[in-house]
């Protein structure tokens, strides 16, 4: 199969951020036949998986799992009025994915997606601590589709659960096919419909979007973009809030030519996991920008503290789901505060993800552990916010003043010695 081509409208952005085809996935086409050799379930789509896994050194790494050129569909079922239809595929070294469909007299809908990845696949999961298959089940949010209509969605959609992000695009799917013929009637996803909001890239300084045309950024540094809007995010375990975060986020991409991207809270969905010693906040801005923040408790310290250990950023092509840029730093030690307290920093801070990507934060207030009554606990402020911050210029000024006085005294003493020498002659 020939490598996928980049959409023309995004060619420039891909050129700025990396080679087009750096991350690739194969299209899947499954045609399930019934006992009479008639098509009963048809699907063609593209998908990929972003997976965070633990290594033997207790660090976390991010893996990108793509479909291979060889995919089987063993176990797929046509379905009936009393039995769900099942679309199942197997690929790579022990990986599998399936989705089941149910119907009534008028409509059909997807119910559950089951994804199994095999951490024994060392090419994808090097040094994985957990060995063997890992299975997650996600409830699909697909709205009911009229029977004998084919579901079509070219735009990118994603599902996040248990450290796995599933990304889909270019989907054409019809279960319960009647008379063995794929329907000509289409039911489009909301993102594909003409009445939907126009597809735009995230807010990017010096990049203008008109339809799908992107103007080039200047060769100099980008003009300062407006500070990002501050968003409020939270995670729950059951009915109890377990993580709170308030922050404005801006990405600074310096690969080849600089770009600034503001994260829009209105289009950003928060997900993640809470735990006693680690917590992860996953932010998804319109299926275009994925940012994961992982917090760790330092239990070895005399006073237990939490801190930001890892940040992972992924930029997706909204048109076809391909990865434009992926960067990770799992060796951070930022935003530390005593366990049970919160961390606050109103001033701008910068997180270095790699040589090409920075994350700027504004109006930050975060508490990833021991949240009580859905409220932030006592805040420990960063040094930039503290009242002692003014002492730095004062101390520098005093040191310079002392140095000037010392030089002046040395000059006076030197002149006196000079005069004494002249008198003795």
UniProtKB/Swiss-Prot annotation:
Annotated region (First lumenal domain) at: 28-192
Stretch list, region Hinge: 193-238
Instruction: Tell me where the signal peptide lies.
Output: 1-27
Name its GO BP terms in alphabetical order.
autophagosome maturation; cellular response to starvation; chaperone-mediated autophagy; lysosomal lumen acidification; lysosomal protein catabolic process; protein targeting; protein targeting to lysosome involved in chaperone-mediated autophagy
Q: Name one GO cellular component term.
A: late endosome membrane
Residue span of region Second lumenal domain: 239-390
Subunit annotation = Monomer. Forms large homooligomers.
Protein's name in the database:
Lysosome-associated membrane glycoprotein 2
> What species is given as this protein's source?
Gallus gallus
Q: What is the lineage of its organism?
A: Eukaryota, Metazoa, Chordata, Craniata, Vertebrata
Q: Which gene encodes it?
A: LAMP2
């Amino acid at each position: 199969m020939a490598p996928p081509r980049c959409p023309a409208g995004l060619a420039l952005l891909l050129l700025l951020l990396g080679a087009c085809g750096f991350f690739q996935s194969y299209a899947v086409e499954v045609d399930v036949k019934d006992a009479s050799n008639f098509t009963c379930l048809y699907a063609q789509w593209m998908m990929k998986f972003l997976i965070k896994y633990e290594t033997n050194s207790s660090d976390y790494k991010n893996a990108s799992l793509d479909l291979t050129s060889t995919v089987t569909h063993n176990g797929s079922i046509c379905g009936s009025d009393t039995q769900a239809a099942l679309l199942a595929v197997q690929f790579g070294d022990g990986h599998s994915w399936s989705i089941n469909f149910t119907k009534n007299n008028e409509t059909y809908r997807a119910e559950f997606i089951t994804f199994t990845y095999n951490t024994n696949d060392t090419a994808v999961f090097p040094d994985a601590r957990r060995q063997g298959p890992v299975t997650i089940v996600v409830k699909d949010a697909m709205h009911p589709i009229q029977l004998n209509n084919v579901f079509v969605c070219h735009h990118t959609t994603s599902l996040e659960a248990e450290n796995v992000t599933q990304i889909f695009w270019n989907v054409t799917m019809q279960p319960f096919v009647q008379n063995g013929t794929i329907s000509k009637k289409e039911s489009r996803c909301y993102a594909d419909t003409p009445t939907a909001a126009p597809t735009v890239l995230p807010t990017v300084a010096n990049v203008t979007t008109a339809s799908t045309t992107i103007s080039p950024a200047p060769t100099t540094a980008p003009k300062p973009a407006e500070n990002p809007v501050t968003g409020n995010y939270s995670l729950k375990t059951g009915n109890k809030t377990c993580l709170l975060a308030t922050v404005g986020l801006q990405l600074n991409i310096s690969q080849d030519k600089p770009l600034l991207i503001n994260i829009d809270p209105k289009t950003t969905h928060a997900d993640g996991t809470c735990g006693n010693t680690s917590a992860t906040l996953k932010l998804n801005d319109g299926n275009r920008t994925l940012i994961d923040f992982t917090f760790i408790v330092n239990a070895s310290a005399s006073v237990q503290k939490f801190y930001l250990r890892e940040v992972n950023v992924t930029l997706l092509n909204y048109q076809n789901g391909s990865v434009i840029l992926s960067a990770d730093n799992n060796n951070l030690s930022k935003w530390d505060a005593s366990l049970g307290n919160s961390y606050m920093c109103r001033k701008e801070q910068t997180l270095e993800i790699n040589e090409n990507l920075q994350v700027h934060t504004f109006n930050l207030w975060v508490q990833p552990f021991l949240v009580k009554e859905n409220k932030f606990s006592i805040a420990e402020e960063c040094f930039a916010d503290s009242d002692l911050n003014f002492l730095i210029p004062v101390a520098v000024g005093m040191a310079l003043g002392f140095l000037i006085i010392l030089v002046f005294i040395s000059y006076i003493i030197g002149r006196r010695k000079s005069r004494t020498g002249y008198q003795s002659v």
